[in-house]
């Protein structure tokens, strides 16, 4: 399904609004105005002038790029990314803090999805172009012009190519690969069972590959599937995620994270033998916030610390 850029889409600037949500194992706390970047009302990460209140870092450290290693701790930084049509956000999957990275610059606008490889190299698509994007600044560099999908992820090395990770996506139910150097698109396979991407795809090294879909025997709107990253076909359906138009999907430590067209953020976990989604409240969001995509590094932990997570076949 293609995103439609309508009058309800808000274009945000860097520091225009930042959400943070508190921790908790089963209960997701809400978002507060706090930006890891901090700053004055008129500076990067600043606030106040736009009516959303002042932003400060509360003494926190600026986050490195997604999936990178914190030098002082030697541990992975649990960052995943989401975006509206024009603005890049980041979510710390441990603290549940979300901050604005900034508006996309360099010519990319109406961005329809993002994908991040194991080294935190990130790519975004619009309907007419493929771009590389800097996760620290949201600056885009054009790679190629063509027709590109709104379901985008890298899959691990050895899946479609023995030597490199492959950038993949869905056009409806058609599974495709995109060359990150030339932008060339190649058909790989298809999703059967009457499902079509709604949607977004995310894949993890040593873990699963997941897709949000519509249709199928459940008349999904939306459901979460495990798919085979070699063929793009169905492995299993987990059922409804209780949200429609889940245009953004990311993953960290055994749980998925959904970002929908209505501006909602939620976690997706496996609880007592069934899929369970927990909304992450967004108090005082900007009017008409709409998420159009999300992504996480393929080197994200595939399971929780206790080994739990969404079960795979």
Regions found by a protein language model. Give the residues of each.
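Blade-level signature of beta-propeller repeat domains, shared across WD40, Kelch, NHL, RCC1
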Residues: 261-313
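Short loop/turn segments that connect beta-strands within beta-propeller blades
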Residues: 92-96, 134-138, 179-183, 228-232, ...
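Conserved beta-propeller blade signature
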Residues: 78-82, 89, 121-125, 131, ...
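An edge-strand/N-cap motif at the start of beta-rich repeat modules
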Residues: 69-102
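Structural motif
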Residues: 87-90, 129-134, 173-179, 218-225, ...
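Repeated scaffold domains used in trafficking and secretory/extracellular systems
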Residues: 70-71, 108-117, 145-158, 193-206, ...
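Ser/Thr-rich, Pro/Gly/Ala-heavy low-complexity intrinsically disordered linkers and tails
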Residues: 17-76, 303-313
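A short beta-strand motif characteristic of beta-propeller blades
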Residues: 97-106, 139-144, 184-192, 233-240, ...
């Amino acid at each position: 399904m293609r995103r439609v850029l309508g009058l309800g889409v808000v274009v945000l600037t860097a520091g225009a609004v930042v959400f943070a949500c508190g921790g908790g194992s089963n209960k997701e706390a809400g978002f507060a105005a706090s930006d890891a970047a901090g700053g004055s009302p008129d500076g990067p990460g600043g606030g106040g002038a736009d009516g959303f209140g002042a932003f400060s870092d509360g003494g926190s450290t600026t986050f490195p790029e997604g999936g990178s290693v914190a030098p002082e701790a030697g541990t992975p930084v649990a960052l995943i990314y989401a975006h509206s049509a024009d603005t890049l956000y980041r979510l710390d999957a441990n603290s549940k803090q979300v901050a604005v990275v900034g508006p996309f610059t360099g010519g990319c606008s109406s961005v329809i999805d993002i994908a991040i490889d194991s080294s935190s190299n990130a790519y975004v698509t619009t309907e007419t172009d493929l771009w590389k994007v800097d996760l620290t600044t949201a600056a885009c560099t054009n790679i190629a012009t063509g027709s590109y999908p709104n379901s985008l992820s890298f899959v691990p090395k050895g899946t479609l190519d023995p030597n490199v990770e492959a950038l993949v996506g869905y056009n409806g139910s058609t599974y495709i690969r995109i060359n990150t150097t030339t932008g060339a698109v190649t058909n790989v396979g298809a999703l059967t069972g009457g499902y079509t991407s709604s949607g977004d795809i995310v894949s993890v090294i040593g873990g699963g590959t997941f897709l949000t879909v519509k249709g199928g025997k459940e008349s999904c709107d939306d459901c979460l599937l495990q798919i085979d990253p070699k063929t793009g076909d169905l492995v299993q359906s987990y059922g409804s995620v209780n949200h429609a138009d889940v245009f953004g999907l990311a993953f960290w430590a055994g749980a998925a994270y959904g970002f929908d067209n209505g501006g909602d953020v939620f976690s997706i976990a496996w609880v007592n033998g069934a899929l369970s989604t927990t909304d992450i409240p967004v108090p005082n969001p900007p009017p008409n916030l709409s998420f159009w995509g999300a992504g996480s590094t393929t080197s994200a932990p595939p399971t929780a610390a206790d080994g739990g997570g969404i079960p795979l076949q």
